[in-house]
Amino acid sequence: MNKTITFILAFFFAITASAQVSNEDLDVKYAASLLPAGTEVPDMLVDTTINLRLSDMRGHYVVLHFWASWCPDCRKDMPEMEKLDKRYDCFEKKGNEVAFVHISYDGDTARMNRYLSEHALNGYRLCQGRKFHDTETARLFGVKWIPSMILIDPQGRVALSTVMVDKLKKALQHLDLSKLDPNAPKAVEMPEFQGGTDALMNYLVQNVHYPTKAMEMGLQSKVRVSFVVDTLGQISDLKIKENNLSAVRKAPISKLNPEERQRTAKECATLFANEAKRVVRSMPAWKPARSFGKKTKVSFMLPITFRL
């Protein structure tokens, strides 16, 4: 009987101890060194390619996420961080007012990118190239534990410093949108054909030439062309991402034997692709994309429909 009582007491103690650990505020132990709420955040370079600095993002909420792929706790929190990034990040959805800056302490960018190839993070990504103890970002923001997260308000002050992703989630759910600066540069401005969408449609109508062979065979296609618009608005790196052939009713191609039909369809698919690339390549310069007012190079996808 005594042994049974001892076992029950020990079991009860174990449950109680476990509950205390699970309910512990980890910020007390691990976030004490982070910049406290109300502190004006120091400036830092966010994107070297467009010389974007943290101070350029004033007027918007910003999340600094300090992490590394070698960190077990970071990997544990990554699914929730992905959800927050997808839900709130300004690059994911127009109208979102939070910019995520993911600062990695991996040894090199390749290692970080290998990990992120399986984890979708839409915001800015910085790789420090070494452990956080030896970095300027850790010194500036007081990072002594990862993952760490700092939510910055539109006035450039710390709204929350934490090592707990659940606290960040709650803070993002209750953002004070009245603090946003309506005059601040937009987080994302996509590239635009000069004159806008109507001008682009008119350009395509006037300049796309239907391939003669495809017309004779009664073939149509919807081609999706991807290309890069650089900071000068110039187009490069054209790629055909989709080329869906279809035939009109009683199309002449249907009268060909299977071998000829296959060869002709392949030939016409190439003609559609080449014409789509030709008309895109011949476009005048676009209005370049901007991120927080800075011109930036981005990829763009354009569908071109060939229909009889």
Residue ranges: model-predicted function:
Residues K93-R111, L121-F132:
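Thiol-based oxidoreductase modules, predominantly thioredoxin-like and allied folds used
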Residues S18-D43, S55, A110, R114-S117, ...:
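N-proximal helix/coil linker or "cap" segments that precede and/or mark the start of modular domains
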Residues P42-V62, K86:
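A short beta-strand-turn-helix
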Residues T6, L151, Q173-L308:
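Charge-biased low-complexity segments
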Residues S22-D25, W145-I146, L151-P185:
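Thiol-/selenol-based redox modules, centered on thioredoxin-like
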Residues M1-E24, S69, L175-P182, L204:
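Bacterial Sec-dependent N-terminal signal peptides
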Residues N113-P154:
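Short, internal strand/loop/helix patches
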Residues G59, F66-R87:
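Conserved redox-active cysteine motifs that mediate thiol-disulfide chemistry
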